[in-house]
Curated annotation (Swiss-Prot):
It is found in: Cell inner membrane. The gene is atpA. F-type ATPases have 2 components, CF(1) - the catalytic core - and CF(0) - the membrane proton channel. CF(1) has five subunits: alpha(3), beta(3), gamma(1), delta(1), epsilon(1). CF(0) has three main subunits: a(1), b(2) and c(9-12). The alpha and beta chains form an alternating ring which encloses part of the gamma chain. CF(1) is attached to CF(0) by a central stalk formed by the gamma and epsilon chains, while a peripheral stalk is formed by the delta and b chains. Its EC number is 7.1.2.2. GO terms for molecular function: ADP binding; ATP binding; proton-transporting ATP synthase activity, rotational mechanism. This is ATP synthase subunit alpha. Its main location: membrane. The keyword Aminoacyl-tRNA synthetase does not apply. The lineage of its organism: Bacteria, Pseudomonadati, Pseudomonadota, Betaproteobacteria, Nitrosomonadales. InterPro entries: ATP_synth_asu-like_sf, ATP_synth_asu_C, ATP_synth_asu_C_sf, ATP_synth_F1_a_nt-bd_dom, ATP_synth_F1_asu, ATPase_a/bsu_AS, ATPase_F1/V1/A1_a/bsu_N, ATPase_F1/V1/A1_a/bsu_N_sf. It catalyses: ATP + H2O + 4 H(+)(in) = ADP + phosphate + 5 H(+)(out). It is an enzyme of class 7 (translocase). It comes from Nitrosomonas europaea (strain ATCC 19718 / CIP 103999 / KCTC 2705 / NBRC 14298).
Length: 513
């Protein structure tokens, strides 16, 4: 076969036209050392702090230490296949995780990858895990409640939408139980929940997920897991990943609730990473920026105004405010709240719920110490009926604790003091509540109203909870309209008060418990 010169030139021309040449300019370096999930990389001259690095085999890492002749990076995930001399590339990107409605009902790892065996997630997009918190001008004051369904919290330390309320206590005092009850109680409240499990046993996390599925709470919940078996790097980034997923809903004008369980283990993971990176240790061997570790995370929980939502959605959503409420959990050692991390988080948050081992072991559950638990902004968000009725409970408990200390030494007590002690004992008894047995506002109001009006005064303390349960059943069966009215209006007017009082008196005359 013979080709003439013109055909050859045409053939070459067409081949050149069909050839696509793209140049890719990326800084790359080589692995110098690799120990305990920490990599030293030489040659990454243009790398940025916090930048995502690409390793062979589809593995990624974060550049944390920028030194004169090398970069200290932490690997996200498995690193057994990596070796010295491997090529590392810069990506010029911050680590991003998937966000969107598709994540609801799913269990994901700290990178947003599904680990529940239910197939891939068709996410609406990805967002960086590190974001700057909304500024003061974009915020709105907290004035809507997050009902936890727990009498002791909603009446004494109320939580508002956009608030950061710390749950603090020793191990095995019911911290997770309080947070899970709060998530379960959001059913039908149009609040999206994110549960971030950090450094926990996989079996404990599986139990939580199973319970949320049982009660139908997974439909509006995302579970982010960095279990105890995962690397310190994954435990360190998990809260930021969960926060980004929650911010997606906040910025759309919706309400979200995020639980960090717990931030003590995140601080431990960060301390481990920092020490391996040879950063200078400070108090309790934590690095100097451990306060910033938690403050930059918790400041992202906020109530944002309509202008912010409109700006974030590009004008698609107008006239709606959004919120992200945070319930961080901190574990103390032997009740020491003056340790480094607990004091840091107490100073960052808008209040704290103290859970005590002594109360828990005495059968008072949730084991909330009403004296030192406080909500700094939640009072403005409390429902009117609970605010009206709950004030007396806190006072009764405060007076009871004060008098109980003196009563131990006094042989004879006057009638008024004895009554106050009895009222305090009864209030303590009625604040008890079983796990997963959350209450509606109207049911809570009924108990508080009956206690304030003295209807429990002649009830044997051992029968108090049985009396309360029977009273609720009676009112629900025979006077359901009263409860419905309180539930709808969240208020207690004079007419409803009279009707409720008459209904309770009727039960006291005829009811059995």
């Amino acid at each position: 076969m013979q080709l003439n010169p013109s055909e050859i030139s045409e053939l070459i021309k067409s081949k050149i036209e069909g050839l696509s040449v793209t140049s890719e300019f990326r800084t790359q370096g080589t692995i110098v050392s690799l120990t305990d999930g920490i990599v030293r990389v030489h040659g990454l001259s243009d790398v940025m702090q916090g930048e995502m690095l690409e390793f062979p085999g589809g593995t990624f890492g974060l550049a944390l230490n920028l030194e004169r002749d090398s970069v200290g990076a932490v690997i996200l995930g498995a690193y057994e296949h990596l070796k010295e001399g491997d090529i590392v590339k810069c990506t010029s990107r911050i680590l991003e995780v998937p966000v969107g409605e598709a994540l609801l009902g799913r269990v994901v790892n700290a990178l947003g990858q599904p680990i529940d065996g239910k197939g891939p997630i068709a996410a609406e997009g990805t967002e960086p895990i590190e974001k700057i918190a909304p500024g003061v001008v974009w915020r709105k004051s907290v004035d809507q409640p997050v009902q936890t369904g727990l009498k002791s919290i909603d009446s004494m330390v109320p939580v508002g939408r956009g608030q950061r309320e710390l749950i603090i206590g020793d191990r095995q005092t019911g911290k997770t139980a309080v947070a899970i009850d709060a998530i379960i109680n959001q059913k039908g409240e149009d609040v999206i929940c994110i549960y971030v499990a950090i450094g926990q046993k996989a079996s404990s996390i599986a139990n939580v997920v199973r319970k949320l599925e049982e009660v139908g709470a997974m439909a509006y919940t995302i579970v982010v897991v960095a279990s105890a078996s995962e690397s310190a790097a994954m435990q360190y980034i998990a809260p930021y990943s969960g926060c980004t997923m929650g911010e997606y809903f906040r910025d759309k004008g919706q309400d979200a609730l995020i639980v960090y369980d717990d931030l003590t283990k995140q601080a431990w993971a960060y301390r481990q990473i920092s020490l391996l990176l040879r950063r200078p240790p400070g108090r309790e061997a934590y690095p100097g920026d451990v306060f910033y570790l938690h403050s930059r995370l918790l400041e992202r929980a906020a109530r944002v105004n309509a202008d912010y939502v409109e700006k974030a959605t590009g004008g698609k959503v107008k006239g709606k405010t959004g919120s992200l409420t945070a319930l961080p959990i901190i574990e103390t050692q032997a009740g020491d709240v003056t340790a480094f991390v607990p004091t840091n988080v107490i100073s960052i948050t808008d209040g704290q719920i103290f859970l005590e081992s002594d109360l828990f072991n005495a059968g008072i559950r949730p084991a909330i110490n009403a004296g030192i638990s406080v909500s700094r902004v939640g009072g403005a968000a409390q429902t009117k009926v609970i605010k009206k009725l709950g004030g007396g409970i806190r006072l009764a408990l405060a007076q009871y604790r004060e008098l109980a200390a003196f009563a131990q030494f006094a042989s004879d007590l006057d009638e008024a003091t004895r009554k106050q002690l009895e009222r305090g004992k009864m209030a303590t008894e009625l604040m008890k509540q079983s796990q997963y047995a959350t209450l509606k506002v109207s049911e809570m109001a009924l108990t508080l109203f009956a206690l304030n009006k003295g209807y429990f005064d002649d009830v044997d303390i051992k029968r108090a909870l049985a009396f309360e349960s029977a009273l609720k059943s009676h009112i629900r069966s025979h006077h359901g309209a009263i409860l419905d009215k309180i539930e709808a209006s969240k208020e207690l007017d004079a007419e409803t008060e009279k009707a409720l009082e008459a209904a309770i008196q009727e039960f006291k005359q005829n009811g059995t418990y």
